[in-house]
């Protein structure tokens, strides 16, 4: 088991292939045997059989080489199931070890010497089988072994085949198999046909599938029988066991293969594609057919065919094998010419073919297998997969290669697998042998040893095709050469990326692709209902990027892949300028040009990424923008779209509004320019609800009782005030929002005042720790509370109604107005005593009022312990009240604050004698808050003006809202 595992890993042979061809077991059974082999003495007779076969397999190097060639062809034709080989013959597992090697070697690869040795071995094994036939009665045919019957069948088949070949000779002359090779090969066919031995049927299946490459579906004859006839002539000593009946069975099988291969051949010649991997089952048959493939390139030049191509004497009978001549997986039409040069005939010559025949299913990506040498270089090295994938991604982005093409041509994986592997590579040590293969391929690709002739297909291979397309399509897209390259690559890359066409065929398909989409392109791009009114624009359309979207999505992707590096910042800047200058919206631009939403367009235009950091998908919008900028008629087309949208919108709006009230054209125009939908515009036309002062008072009193009224309360209020329920709900919502805004303004102002006072108080710098806590507890709170009172008083004329809700409010209001400057006065008095510390918010400024100092000093020590916790509690309480209700919030100035209560008589006596700055006594709340010019300093210069501006702006907005709300007549908002 260990030796077998080593050989399988060394030659990159899968356990599934090994199990099918050598052990006759499933992959799971093989894995179990190799991973956990039982001791010999514990095995049954049947359990020992796989080990006998493995020993026989290891005894000859040719077995390993043959199995490796089968594995290589299986990788080249991944769509083919291995079970296809086992359909024609019943499967059994009791073949002798000699037969195991037979079936492996039947599909051997290698040089001429290897092929000859295989053929000689086949002769010997046929003789062994012939002698063993009496022991296998089931394998002998009951019809007798008449050579004459078989020869007559073979001669008839030969005549039919020569007639077919004569019809194809002008167009095809690939190298046929030599008669000698066919003669040597064919003994395997007839004897193994009647035999049910599994060991010999793969040669039968393979060699039967070899010739069915005749292109004509109607010609249902077999190319093989001539070879069989020659064999029967060349090896007369062999007693052919197959009777007429078995030979007829062989003929029937081969005819069915011929029918399928004829269909495939028509398709192959219709697209002139030499790639075998894209062919359906008959194609797989050809890849399985031959004696072997070359090992070195991991390619698929089969033994007899390769030999025939080297021997000029062989160029005769199997003209249908043309495509099989290319020794490795053909990746482009140039490789088909390689095969053609061997056959001395151009393969691009026109042939009667039916391009209608579709492929049975899309071909899976397939790549040539890696050679053992390539495996050995990297398999046992430690590879940094993260760095490797990073380099691969960079190279893909630099060369504009899509992951799909890279996966199909280099890794043999789907786009999803490639994306997953490149984004989340596993560590090398955690990868299985199969998991390491893609990374080995990536490394070889980076080193230029793999796939270099494949990837340029995307941008360079079809250069002549591009020129022919542009010459054919000069009326189309004359302004933008790059857009002409789009259909080119889409034709080669998108429909059948793994099968590039010849230039003549692709030009034909490209002209169709380029000519057809142009008229419908505008419609598909616009995607708007009023598009039919825009046919004249489609004449001027060709130079715009809009037609690009009319092609397949891949066409723009391929254009992106070939695009040179673009200045994304410059492109977005120009686009923004054009849109702004012409009053075009981003939504219209995004939907019409880029196929994106307004949000995506805004993001692209405001924060464009550098080109090299963008994926292919991310580059697409910038390519579209560039093409749009290059179009001289770009603005006119967008303006037309805008006008059509406007007309459609007005029609919809008119139909929706006509029932209730007529819409006025000017207002509709304004609504459209704002880009709003019909429903919001309809709501904006409703008359504005204006509440009477009595209604406002009643609602405010209700708010003080319950800021969040229940539905029942709302209904009662609406009934009492004769208002709509929705009006009452909206009033409560708006009033709560106003309270929150005022609290926000107060916090901003309090913070700016505290910072200004703390930074510039001379005594603050020399104050001690204990007095600073006292100052913080007192001034900090009042500085936060006093301004709120003044601001609420000044900014809202009806603010007093918020707090008291009764007669008391008249008595409280004057007191509040007088208290507005108190924070400034307190700040001016306090610092004589121990003032707040330098970093405190509630510091004071230099001012008269010396008597305040001793009192502050006396108060300080007794209040120090709880000084810090109280302001925090108060702030939390204040936020709760701001959310829950405005009653206590607005009555806060009346109760004064904790410090005012503690100051006692000293505070009340100091107030009248204090001469505060004149600015602090002004009615304007802003001036009372920010009226101390000496409070501004160098360190505060950066953030204080910004805070002032914010507060002033919010104050002015609220003031205007209050003024507008207090008016009787309905007016529009003015900002």
UniProtKB/Swiss-Prot annotation:
PROSITE patterns in UniProt: CUT, HOMEOBOX_1, HOMEOBOX_2
Annotated region of DNA binding: 1-73, 374-461, 557-644, 684-743
Compartments (UniProt record): Nucleus
Cross-link (Glycyl lysine isopeptide (Lys-Gly) (interchain with G-Cter in SUMO2)): 229, 255, 286, 724
Pfam families, alphabetized: CUT (PF02376), Homeodomain (PF00046)
A Gene Ontology term for the protein's cellular component: nucleus
Family to which this protein belongs: Belongs to the CUT homeobox family.
Function (record text): Transcription factor involved in the control of neuronal differentiation in the brain. Regulates dendrite development and branching, and dendritic spine formation in cortical layers II-III. Also involved in the control of synaptogenesis. In addition, it has probably a broad role in mammalian development as a repressor of developmentally regulated gene expression. May act by preventing binding of positively-activing CCAAT factors to promoters. Component of nf-munr repressor; binds to the matrix attachment regions (MARs) (5' and 3') of the immunoglobulin heavy chain enhancer.
Name of the molecule in the record: Homeobox protein cut-like 1
Provenance organism: Canis lupus familiaris
Gene that encodes it: CUX1
